[in-house]
């Protein structure tokens, strides 16, 4: 078992409006079902454990492309949307934000009893991962969201998020069971986060001596521990002013590299984890996206010959704007991990609730949903042609990207989206009444 990724995200307030929350639940369910249909439940958990894919997944559903709320809204949408399909798809989601996270143990026990798992072992895993991210990594983030995703075969992934009020950031931690072998030796598969300077990482592979020393100290008499600490402070020239723990910690951080103390910047160099750091600005900028990849999507949607071929693949007449969205959704379903290095690009499927990069085009969103749901329903009845065409759409877009030079004109694309927004029932939170539903 290993933490698969980490992401740092700017803290944003507010809630997801009802009109978007309902659509996110439906689209999230449809995307999940497509992945499970084509690749299996294990593949869905692998994707969920990648912080870059997770960010693209949220962006393609119309959530803010970079804020802390993407974690809460995506997991809330999945929990609501998959609840009635859990046994059919073999995917169960437990926990949530705040008080809902405290329901995780009981929810796990109920599922374990139904599926024949060791419920207490799952509960132990849930608690250990939360403790590692809350306590064993001194990065200043307090966990407030904990979601445990379990498959019918017993594989699991965990997505949890902490906040740091002082920095105004949230940090998302990803875990995945096939990668984790030791809870106290580099267990994460990924972390999404911004550099917070020097931290103490007690689950680093090099931290075994520090872990052993801490266990030894815990068994010593308190008086002996304090005397040795005072002696150490005298030798290092640190004056005891009453804040003994703080001074000792800072001294250790500066000198004890062998004890697993390291800068967050070296995390990416020393481990195989995926690390995502989102910028502080709210608007989408050209440097946030791969313009050639976006250009390929737009070429397929708007160039007549390419558009006609894409329609042949999908066996349906579609407008260019809907085809643009479906091409990006298809990439989320079928794309390789390297395709998600620019998650902001996926906000060009359905915009963002805060108008970044443009308002959510509800008509396009619903057309995308209807196509995907219709393709899935047909596949359940044995007709897989549309779903197969949806897979080939991703390959076609990548072929266009490789064989042509389709770099997008960023300003022109934004201007076009803003111009057509009224005709597509473009909507944002600024158009809504003050009261909006909570995420869970």
Which sequence ranges carry the predicted segments?
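HhH-family (HhH-GPD) DNA N-glycosylase catalytic core used in base-excision repair
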Residues: 1-440
């Amino acid at each position: 078992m290993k933490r698969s990724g980490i992401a740092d995200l700017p803290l944003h307030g507010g809630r997801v409006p009802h009109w978007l929350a309902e659509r996110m639940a439906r689209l999230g369910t449809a995307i999940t079902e497509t992945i499970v249909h084509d690749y299996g439940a294990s593949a869905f958990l692998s994707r969920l454990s990648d912080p870059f894919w997770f960010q693209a997944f949220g962006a393609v559903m119309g959530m803010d492309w970079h804020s802390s709320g993407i974690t809460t809204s995506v997991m809330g949408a999945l929990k609501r949307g998959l609840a009635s399909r859990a046994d059919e798809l073999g995917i169960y989601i437990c926990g949530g934000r705040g008080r809902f996270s405290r329901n995780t143990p009981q929810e796990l026990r109920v599922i374990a009893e139904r599926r024949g798992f060791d419920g207490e072992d799952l509960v132990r895993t849930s608690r250990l991962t939360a403790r590692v991210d809350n306590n064993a990594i001194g990065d200043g983030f307090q966990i407030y969201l904990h979601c445990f995703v379990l498959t019918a075969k017993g594989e699991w992934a965990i997505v949890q998020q902490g906040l740091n009020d002082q920095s105004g950031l949230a940090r998302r931690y990803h875990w995945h069971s096939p990668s984790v072998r030791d809870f106290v030796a580099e267990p994460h598969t990924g972390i999404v986060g911004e550099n917070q300077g020097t931290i103490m990482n007690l689950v680093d592979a090099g931290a075994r001596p520090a872990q052993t020393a801490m266990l030894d100290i815990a068994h010593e008499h308190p008086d002996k521990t304090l005397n040795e600490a005072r002696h150490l402070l005298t030798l290092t020239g640190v004056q005891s002013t009453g804040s003994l723990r703080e001074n000792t910690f800072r001294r250790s951080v500066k000198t004890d590299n062998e004890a697993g103390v390291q800068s967050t910047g070296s995390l990416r160099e020393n481990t195989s984890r995926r690390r995502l750091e989102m910028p502080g600005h709210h608007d989408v900028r050209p440097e946030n996206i791969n313009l050639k990849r976006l250009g390929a999507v737009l070429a397929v949607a708007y160039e007549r010959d390419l558009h006609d071929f894409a329609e042949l693949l999908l066996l349906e007449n579609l407008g260019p704007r809907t085809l643009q969205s479906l091409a990006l959704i298809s990439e989320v379903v079928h794309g390789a991990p390297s395709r998600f290095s620019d998650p902001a690009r996926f906000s060009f499927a359905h915009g963002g609730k805060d108008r970044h990069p443009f308002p959510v085009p509800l008509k396009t969103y619903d057309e995308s949903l209807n196509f995907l749901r219709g393709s899935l329903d047909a596949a359940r009845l044995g007709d897989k042609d549309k779903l197969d065409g949806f897979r080939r759409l991703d390959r076609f877009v990548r072929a266009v990207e490789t064989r042509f030079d389709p770099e997008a004109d960023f300003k022109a694309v934004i201007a076009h989206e803003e111009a057509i927004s009224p005709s597509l029932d473009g909507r944002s939170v600024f158009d809504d009444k003050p009261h909006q539903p909570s995420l869970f």
